């Protein structure tokens, strides 16, 4: 390519939710995962749903009339303190599926209240003592 256009980051991830699920979304994304709800722009507020953020990570939940949860496609949220977050999820009744660790990474899968799959990953030191990130 000869122009200077390039993708530099993911701005947000959008997941679908059923109509009327905003309170369940708040309880899970803010209450369990610890994200902060952010106000939706006035132009989009009437559509329902809710937006959440932690640092530069944004997760948007949008209402979908013919809702079906994403069970394969999923965001992977990088965390610090995976064991503590897993304990918080389990205490809240969220099923945690541990997955095969990858080199330099521990990971688990959970589902939001609507059945959308979410992967939680934490970078861990490799055997050589260097950070895997």
Please give the residue ranges for each predicted region.
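N-terminal beta-strand motif that seeds the catalytic metal site of vicinal oxygen chelate
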Residues: 1-26, 73-75, 128-133
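Vicinal oxygen chelate
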Residues: 1-8, 10-19, 50-53, 64-89, 92-133, ...
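A short linear hydrophobic-aromatic micro-motif
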Residues: 37-39, 61, 95-98
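Core segments of cupin and vicinal oxygen chelate
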Residues: 15-57
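A short beta-turn/loop motif at secondary-structure boundaries
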Residues: 42-45, 66-69, 100-103
